[in-house]
């Protein structure tokens, strides 16, 4: 077995810890520093960075197992900050922000919590961008290339992240971006049933980062009509109409989803086979949408952006990439390898000689 790439330092803690909440989600919240483990263990640092604790009311062992595999990949520290160890957190929580976390606040007396520990990798892409839109525009293409390189690395090892969005990309003090939160990760080769994807069931039109094919299959499973689904998707998110206006020559959302529902074998086995073939493209949609949204923010909110070098000299190739990666039809969606080839002339990691951690 490969050596642990982190060698996190564990010390015996005394007194109150006290950690600030960094983020919250459906299954739990993250705190910095990591809360105390039951029995008194305290994770102070991981890979030379402060330890962050992700506390959940669900079992995190699967996420940690995948995290260790992800972090054993070449150049992993430059692209990922995955959880690599876990413990049962000490309760009651002494962290002052614990009361702001609904999962902790609303838990029953017999709730069992788990905590995954990962290195602090900065602030979310959303907050980092909002803090300085000019800085974000100046580093946009380098950031995009770096994230594409990371995707090539983990997908080349057979993984799909399955939860890429603005909140699961962190940017550190040097402007290096890393993917976090591999809790929904899966391997397409292992998909035999829908539940192997770990994305649940039930049509959820508010989840714009879910690829159109996921919405289409959930419509089928819930026995909703395509017309109903399209109306709900468009009502919840303006991105679909904006993408159709920006890229008018490609298939519309209605055409793409309709073709999927007509041509795919709509059984548990049929949907699983489709995802074995096209599951990696869920991430292609997600990163394309992230970076397209950021580009649109520049166009809308950054004065003088259309006079910038990025806009005048790189807009053409960037639109090809963004349009390709946000194709509604996964069969023609652009891969990160193809995107890197267009942007840099290379196909893999190291295209921009990223900062080494």
Give the residues covered by each predicted segment.
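ATP-binding glycine-rich loop module of kinase domains
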Residues: 24-97
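Conserved structural core of kinase catalytic domains
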Residues: 78-140
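C-lobe/activation-segment region of protein kinase-like
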Residues: 177-302
């Amino acid at each position: 077995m490969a050596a642990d790439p982190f060698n996190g330092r564990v010390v015996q803690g005394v007194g109150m810890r006290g950690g600030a909440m960094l983020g919250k989600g459906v299954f739990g919240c993250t705190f910095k520093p990591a809360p105390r483990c039951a029995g008194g263990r305290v994770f102070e640092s991981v890979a030379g960075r402060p330890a962050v604790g992700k506390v959940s009311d669900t079992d995190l062992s699967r996420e940690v197992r995948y995290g260790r595999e992800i972090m054993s990949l070449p150049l992993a520290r430059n692209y990922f900050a995955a959880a690599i160890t876990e413990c049962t957190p000490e309760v009651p929580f002494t962290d002052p922000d614990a009361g702001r976390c609904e999962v902790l606040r609303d838990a029953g007396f017999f709730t069992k919590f788990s905590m995954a520990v990962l290195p602090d990798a900065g602030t979310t892409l959303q907050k980092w961008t909002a803090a300085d839109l000019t800085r974000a525009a100046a580093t946009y293409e380098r950031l995009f290339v770096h994230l594409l390189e990371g995707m090539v690395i983990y997908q080349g090892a057979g993984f799909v992240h399955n939860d890429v969005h603005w909140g699961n990309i962190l940017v550190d003090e040097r402007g290096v971006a890393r993917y976090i939160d591999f809790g929904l990760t899966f391997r397409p080769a292992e998909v035999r049933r829908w539940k192997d994807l770990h994305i649940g069931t039930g049509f959820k039109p508010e989840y714009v980062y879910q690829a159109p094919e996921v919405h289409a299959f959930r419509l089928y499973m819930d026995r909703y009509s395509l017309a109903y689904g399209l109306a709900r998707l468009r009502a919840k998110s303006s991105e679909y109409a904006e993408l159709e206006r920006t890229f008018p020559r490609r298939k519309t959302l209605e055409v793409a989803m309709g073709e999927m529902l007509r041509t795919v074998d709509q059984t548990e086995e049929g949907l699983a086979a489709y995802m074995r073939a096209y599951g990696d493209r869920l991430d292609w949609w997600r990163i394309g949408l992230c970076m397209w949204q950021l580009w649109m923010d520049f166009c809308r909110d950054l004065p003088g952006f259309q006079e910038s070098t990025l806009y005048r000299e790189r807009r053409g190739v960037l639109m090809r990439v963004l349009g390709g990666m946000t194709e509604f039809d996964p069969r023609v969606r652009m891969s990160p390898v193809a995107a890197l080839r267009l942007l840099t002339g290379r196909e893999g990691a190291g295209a921009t000689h990223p900062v080494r951690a």
